[in-house]
Amino acid sequence: MKSTCYMIGILLLILQNTYQSPVPEADGSSRSVKAARNEAVDDSEQLKEVKRHSQGTFTSDYSKYLDSRRAQDFVQWLMNTKRSGGLSRRNADYERHAEGTFTSDVTQHLDEKAAKEFIDWLINGGPTKEIISRRNAEIERHAEGTYTNDVTEYLEEKATKAFIEWLIKGKPKKIRYSRHAEGTFTNDMTNYLEEKAAKEFVGWLINGRPKRKDLLEEH
């Protein structure tokens, strides 16, 4: 009887050990299942990121973030500028430009400066009566055409005088005769007279126009 009970106890222990041994395997399997689920979640998150990049939603979210950041910075800048009073001054300048008052003020300043300089010039002497009368006379002569006539007469007289001197001090007769026949003498004379007249006319303009009386005395 005792042996039978002993055998039954051993069988019960064996059965108990048999049922208890799969428990760690179940725990390990549950952990592996959780790990697999976590990996699946990570993979799904990565797939979502890839899809967002491919669909442009990631870039859109990044742009929204940058826009919101710029908006915050701009609001902060406005608050700081308003405190310092710089914004009101800038708005005033912009309004003046838009209304044209800024340009008008600049024009008015330049006009006042020009008027002041002109008054100072008049006070410090200005044009003398002799200069004014001489200018008026020159204007009248230009209008009547006498100024151009005097210039033409002066050039003709100087050219004639220079041509006579050139003939007196010119080349030998034989050379002049042959050149007359070829026509080169006339061309050279024309060129010389034109150059001489132009040179003397420039000098006449620089040194002042001689009077007609002086020209007559020279001849």
Curated annotation (Swiss-Prot):
The keyword Secreted applies. GO terms for molecular function: glucagon receptor binding; hormone activity. It is found in: Secreted. Residues 21-50, 84-95, 136-140, 175-178, 213-219 form a propeptide. Pfam families: Hormone_2. One of its GO terms (cellular component) is extracellular space. SMART domains: GLUCA. Residues 23-43 are annotated as: Disordered. Residues 1-20 form the signal peptide. Gene3D superfamilies: 6.10.250.590. It comes from the Eukaryota. GO terms for biological process: adenylate cyclase-modulating G protein-coupled receptor signaling pathway; negative regulation of apoptotic process; positive regulation of insulin secretion involved in cellular response to glucose stimulus; protein kinase A signaling. Keywords: Cleavage on pair of basic residues, Hormone, Secreted, Signal. Transmembrane segments: none annotated. Promotes hydrolysis of glycogen and lipids, and raises the blood sugar level. Belongs to the glucagon family. This is Glucagon-2. It comes from Xenopus laevis (African clawed frog). The gene is gcg2.
